[in-house]
Amino acid sequence: MERARDRLHLRRTTEQHVPEVEVQVKRRRTASLSNQECQLYPRRSQQQQVPVVDFQAELRQAFLAETPRGG
């Protein structure tokens, strides 16, 4: 019984400590990635590219809504 308790205790302590380290690593990675992306691609190009896709989708929906079905 004592061994089982020790295993459970070890499991709980490791589960508590490991995610904190993972979160810190993920934050560092995302921060470094965002910095690299800002340097590689200027924000103007990103802002211009994204609305075009939405605009095309809106046009397609409006066109499908206006065209009579079956005809």
Swiss-Prot record:
Pfam families: SNURF. GO terms for cellular component: nuclear speck; nucleus. GO terms for molecular function: ATPase binding. Expressed in heart, skeletal muscle and lymphoblasts (at protein level). Expressed in brain, pancreas, heart, liver, lung, kidney and skeletal muscle. Belongs to the SNURF family. It is found in: Nucleus. Encoded on a bicistronic transcript that code for two proteins, SNRPN and SNURF. In addition to the primary 1.6-kb bicistronic SNURF-SNRPN transcript, SNURF-only transcript is also detected. This is SNRPN upstream reading frame protein. PANTHER family: SNRPN UPSTREAM READING FRAME PROTEIN, SNURF (PTHR14508), SNRPN UPSTREAM READING FRAME PROTEIN-RELATED (PTHR14508:SF2). Keywords: Nucleus. InterPro entries: SNURF.
